[in-house]
Amino acid sequence: MNTRPLVLPELLPLLEEVPTVDLSPDALPGFRRGLEYAAGQSFLQAEDYPVILERLTIPATDTAPDLRLLTVRPRKDATSPRPVLLHLHGGGYFAGQPELTATQLCQFAQDLDCVVISPDYRLTPKHPFPAAIEDAYTTLCWITRNADTLGIDASRIGLTGESAGGGLAAGLALLTRDREGPPLLFQNLVYPVLDDRTTTGQPDASPVGGEFIWTRASNTFMWTALLNPITPGSADVSPYAAPARATDLSDLPPTYLSVGALDLFLDEDLAYAQRLIHQGVSVELEIVPGACHIFDQTDTPVATRSIARRIDAMKRGFGL
């Protein structure tokens, strides 16, 4: 179905700036180079914000290498320990880095008066599941152990992520609940990747999702690399990799979920939000008409409004 007429006019330039590509092993190097360039540009722009950006390292263990972190904190002095926002970047699990959305992280740190910490987690296809989520959990535990040094309040940890990072955040919320790890005040999920079964073809799937930016072919490539050697859609996929597989969603933190109406992930995100509600989790859901994947990575009114709502939800989550 031709969905271009459904795209908000202000987002049409995005379709020219980010050409839609069906990802494959051959296309992956070029995709990574594009995100590396975008990350560099975003990091340069971040220097205009009244924040301090710092790169830290969690030392290697017997089972994992050094883990690099990007931290962002307001430049102004704190009068008390700040809340902390754990951010997980997007990029299909096989590309990206914390600097990819550095300007947004600066805005979060500034508007929420919090410390933002984003790990440079291991990527597929070299490091399939569970490498990324274990890196995310390692970061969460490191935050609580180093709260005094970081000047943060370990009882006020929020979680956010976009796209693959949103799926990783949802998986981390499940994992830390089941491991009785550090408590989370909220999960703020932006067009999260949640369900590997979308690769198998579903007759009731939205006919308007996935034409632009992130396609069904790219989605299949992503899930295949993440779950290797397990086949996407098979019975033994972990809910920590595909949170939609979880049967028990109770006792998860209050959730804010945002997705565009033209995003490939619309159906799985709506289904997840509904199941959270049915199991007693507080949920706010934003569906953005005329918006495709990564719409919020643009300098447009619709992106500004969506990010403002996201920040407002996190303020309430932190009790601000």
Model-predicted segments: where are they?
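Alpha/beta-hydrolase active-site loop
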Residues: H127-T149, R310
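Gly/Ala-rich beta-loop-alpha elbow adjacent to hydrolase catalytic centers
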Residues: G161, G165, A169
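Alpha/beta hydrolase fold serine-hydrolase catalytic domain that processes acyl esters and thioesters
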Residues: A154-R156, A170-L320
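Short beta-strand element of the alpha/beta-hydrolase
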Residues: P81-G91
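Short amphipathic alpha-helix adjacent to the substrate-entry channel of hydrolases
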Residues: E99-P119
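A glycine/proline-hinged amphipathic helix-loop "lid/cap" segment
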Residues: M1-P74, P232-G233, P301, R305, ...
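Gly/Ser-rich "nucleophile elbow"/oxyanion-hole loop immediately N-terminal to the catalytic nucleophile
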Residues: T144-L159, R179
